Every structure is written in C-alpha cells, then in structure tokens.
C-alpha cells in the first residue's frame, strides 16, 4: 500500500498550478501586497506613535507563514492533504486580526490608518481562504471557482491530480477476502487480496483431502458462491464532471470521462466513486472531479 501511495503521490512544485488558477493567483497576490502594506505601516506607526500593539508583530509572522504555506500547497497540488491544517491556521489568523483591528482601526493617525488597511485586506483574504479550503471539492462554490483553473485541464494534471498520498484502497480496486471457518481453510493456500502482500502458505498436497471433507470446491469457495464480486447494479446518484479525467493506464479500475459529462454514481461516501457512463462503461472516478446533481 505504501508503494502505491508513493507511486501516485510524489510530485514536485509546479508554478503552472498557481499561474493557471485565477483565484489562487489573485488571492496570493493580494495577500502579499496587504502584508507588505501592513508591515511597512506597522514599522512607521511603531516609530511615530509608540502605540502599536505587540500583537501586530505576531500577526505579521503568522500571516507570512500562512501565505507561504498556501502558495506551496497550491503549487504542489496537495490541497487535499493540508486543507484541514490551513483552515485551522487561517481561522486563528482571522481571530487575532479582528482583535488587532478593534484596537487600531479607530485611530485617526495616518500610520495607524495605513496599517489598518493592510490588516483589513489580510482579513478578507483569510475569510475567503477559510471558505475555499474548508469546503469539500464537490461544494458548489468551490467547484465554480475551480472551474476557472486552466492547469487542471492539462493532460499531466489529469493523470497526477490526486489526494496527496495517492488513491486509497477501496472496495472497487481491492476485493475483500472471503470469510471462512478455520476448518474450511485448513490446508489451503490463501491468496492475498492485495498484490505484493505475501501470506504464509500451507502445503498444497493437503488441499485435496480437505476439499472432500469440508465441501469446499476446488476454487477455494463453498458451492454456490461466485469467484468475484461484481459491480453494483444500482446507480441512484447523478454527477457532472467539472474537469476532464484520463484514467491511469496501469489501473484497470479507473474510468475516463470528459468535462461536463454526466455520470451515474452508486456510492458517494468515499473519495473515489463507482460510476457508470452513458455508454455503459463502469469504473471508479475521483470525487473532486465530479459534482452531484
């Protein structure tokens, strides 16, 4: 499992993820400009008035860390990995900004007013980021914002845009092991349900006697049971693709689809959904490429 995660999740930073996303580019630029205004104005206010609260310096340090973290997360396409931590720090920053602004925004001196303007801009950006990073990818506001991202339409991004640590093992990609009693499995070689995981194997020459004594068939399953679990027959949900996606050629379980294509979905509880196209093709699709109708 760790090998598959490394295979899907190791990616470097790509400036195209920031430049090709209007929301990311605009919000990061405004945040950097607001921080510079607040920093310079705070220095001037501290020198001229000596009334600037010490909380301002803590906020400036916190804000530069948050802006840098947001830039890194978007550039490396690891939003799904770090969005909880980002939302927590942005909430903390917005709370402390509110306390600071309550103490300086009503000061009529020019340096304080300039500093207040910078901190107000930072507050607005923090509030927008809290909504964006705190929302699920399928949420309508976030899906609408993401629809303008040019980089997510590229071929390379379609193949590599994952959840940071790679696609988790789901029931569609890994078949669960069949449950038998110890008497039924005595003397059998138990094949691993996950490729690459070795299990202890019993001698093969003991399998024939146990087949006859327990009534288990030669395929290792009781009579009347199928060898594999088939795909679901009901697809109660409908979803619209907000990006195009090209299935990984090394994973036969994935399904390709184009932007704005309508898919039928059987289960929406996981990060990868079992879907069916209008052509009848079935497979799993990443949930952050789809929005429920």
Swiss-Prot record:
Protein name (database record): High osmolarity signaling protein SHO1
Residues covered by region (Disordered): 155-233
Main location: membrane
Keyword entries, A-Z: Cell membrane, Membrane, SH3 domain, Stress response, Transmembrane, Transmembrane helix
Subunit structure: Forms homooligomers.
UniProt-listed SUPFAM superfamilies: SH3-domain (SSF50044)
Membrane topology (UniProt): Multi-pass membrane protein
Domain of life: Eukaryota
Membership in a protein family: Belongs to the SHO1 family.
SMART domains hit by this protein: SH3
Annotated Pfam families: SH3_1 (PF00018)
Subcellular localization, as worded in the UniProt entry: Cell membrane
Native organism: Verticillium alfalfae (strain VaMs.102 / ATCC MYA-4576 / FGSC 10136)
Positions of the SH3 domain: 234-293
Residues spanning the membrane: 23-43, 55-75, 81-101, 114-134
Record's compositionally biased regions (Polar residues): 157-189, 197-217
Function in brief: Plasma membrane osmosensor that activates the high osmolarity glycerol (HOG) MAPK signaling pathway in response to high osmolarity.
């Amino acid at each position: 499992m760790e090998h598959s995660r490394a295979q899907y999740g190791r990616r470097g930073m790509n400036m195209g993820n920031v430049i090709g996303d209007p929301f990311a580019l605009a919000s990061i630029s405004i945040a950097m400009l607001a921080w510079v205004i607040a920093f310079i104005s705070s220095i001037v206010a501290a020198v001229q008035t000596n009334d600037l609260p010490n909380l301002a310096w803590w906020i400036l340090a916190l804000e530069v860390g948050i802006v840098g973290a947001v830039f890194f997360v978007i550039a490396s396409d690891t939003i799904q990995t770090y969005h909880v931590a980002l939302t927590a720090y942005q909430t903390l920053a917005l709370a402390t900004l509110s306390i600071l602004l309550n103490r300086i925004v009503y000061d009529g001196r020019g340096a304080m007013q300039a500093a207040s303007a910078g901190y107000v801009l930072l507050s607005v950006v923090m509030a927008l980021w809290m909504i964006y990073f705190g929302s699920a990818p399928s949420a309508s506001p976030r899906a609408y914002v993401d629809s303008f991202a040019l980089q997510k339409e590229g071929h390379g991004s379609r193949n590599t845009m994952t959840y940071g640590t790679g696609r988790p093992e789901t029931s569609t990609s890994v078949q669960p092991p069949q449950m038998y009693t110890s008497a039924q499995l005595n003397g059998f070689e138990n094949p691993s349900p996950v490729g690459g995981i070795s299990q202890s194997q019993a001698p093969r020459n003991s399998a024939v006697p146990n087949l006859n004594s327990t009534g288990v068939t030669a395929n290792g399953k009781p009579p009347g049971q199928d060898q594999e679990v088939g795909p679901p027959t009901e697809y109660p949900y409908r979803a619209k693709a907000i990006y195009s996606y090209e299935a990984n050629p090394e994973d036969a379980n994935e399904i390709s689809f184009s932007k704005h294509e309508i898919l039928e979905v059987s289960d929406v509880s996981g990060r990868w959904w079992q879907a069916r196209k209008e052509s009848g093709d079935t497979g799993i699709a990443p949930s952050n490429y789809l929005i429920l109708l």
